[in-house]
Amino acid sequence: CKETGSNQFVGNWPGVTVEKKEGRLKGHKDVIVTDLPGIYSLSPYTLEEVVARNYLVGERPDVILNIIDGTNLERNLYLTTQLVELGIPVVAAVNMMDVVKKNGDKINISQLSTELGCEVCEISALKGTGITEAAEKAIKAAQSNTKMIPQHTFSGVVEHALAHIEEAVLHDMPEGQQRWYAIKIFERDEKVLAMMNIPKDK
């Protein structure tokens, strides 16, 4: 990894065979980068999704640097909206921008940032461009502890239900975490229901 150099630890996540990679960020000895498995959603259907979700929800890192494939934007943005809902500062780095431009396509980074409610920047992992800048933006977001305000909203009925769940069930939880848990309870997510001791048929 270019940004961590050779100072990297590779092992497995506890209890599973999914590889775990961690390293210190070049020029920032106090910054540890944890490379999570590549996923498209926080729904725990695959082992990779379970590992990534458990880490994000349980460990609550200071910031999430979400690498997005610019050539397949729509598929990647579903995860980004879920990450913003976690209440953890998010920086979305749109990768393969060189390919996007070569294909004659355009991505309005400023508008995307507004729509997602998080910082968005361009990178090309292949050419090594924008990576240091993305890391610096992530550090800045972590240090400022920017409050994430999800821009994605549901229909009025669903939003009303989510507000009711937050008030009735999640009032003791930090405000920034309530929306994600409310959505998962609304979806009848088995792992969240079990964690919150909520009967499945309630």
Name every feature range the model reports, one short phrase each.
Residues 35, 95, 124:
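Active-site glycine-centered loops adjacent to acidic/histidine catalytic or metal-binding residues
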Residues 117, 144-202:
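Extended helical scaffolds that flank P-loop GTPase cores
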Residues 3-4, 56, 68, 138, ...:
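Hydrophobic aliphatic residues
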Residues 14-18, 32, 48-51, 60, ...:
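Helical mechanochemical/support elements of P-loop NTPase systems and associated helical scaffolds
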Residues 98-153:
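Canonical P-loop GTPase G-domain recognition
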Residues 10, 40, 44, 71, ...:
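Catalytic cores of large soluble enzymes that bind and process phosphate-bearing ligands
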Residues 23-29, 51-121:
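Conserved C-terminal guanine-recognition region of P-loop GTPase G domains, centered on the G4
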Residues 1-47, 57-63, 85:
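Conserved G1/Walker A P-loop phosphate-binding module
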